[in-house]
Amino acid sequence: MRVAVDTNLLAYAEGVNSAARRAEAQALLLRLPDRSVVVPAQVLGELFRVLTRKAGVSGESARATIMSWADAFEVEGTTPEVLLRAADLAASHRIDIWDAVILSTAASSGCRLLLSEDLQDGFTWGSVTVVNPFAVQLNPLLDAALKHG
């Protein structure tokens, strides 16, 4: 099962927020099979902004960080088709355009899940279901995607 990740999951894994959330995000990412994870390019851009603006990281360090994530997982870019579908999604569901780009990228990449704390948990668009990876109760789809053992 292919799984897309949103900015907040990577930001938490980088230590933005709290040590407890960092450990939780890192543990979750380690349990996802590497070849199943998709990072929309939009997420890397947002992560750069979060690191430089919110976390006070230098531009050079933030660039190195996003390159590390790009090396670790498959990165999918924003095509004109993805952007147009995102605009339709944003207009029809009143979702922020940049969140819609991430969801549209996940759909075009064949992902079944988008792990996000920002979008509505359980929202399904096409074949992609948004799952809050930090929800108290583990979503069955996320559980199925995780490595066990």
Residue ranges: model-predicted function:
Residues 41-45, 67, 71-92:
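Acidic catalytic patch
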Residues 1-39, 54-61, 137-143, 147-149:
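Short, well-structured N-terminal submotif of metal-dependent ribonuclease cores
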Residues 103, 108-149:
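Acidic, PIN/NYN-like endoribonuclease modules and their adjacent C-terminal/linker elements
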Residues 7, 80, 99-100:
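Conserved glycosyltransferase catalytic-site signature
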Residues 46-74:
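Active-site-proximal, substrate-binding regions of enzyme catalytic domains
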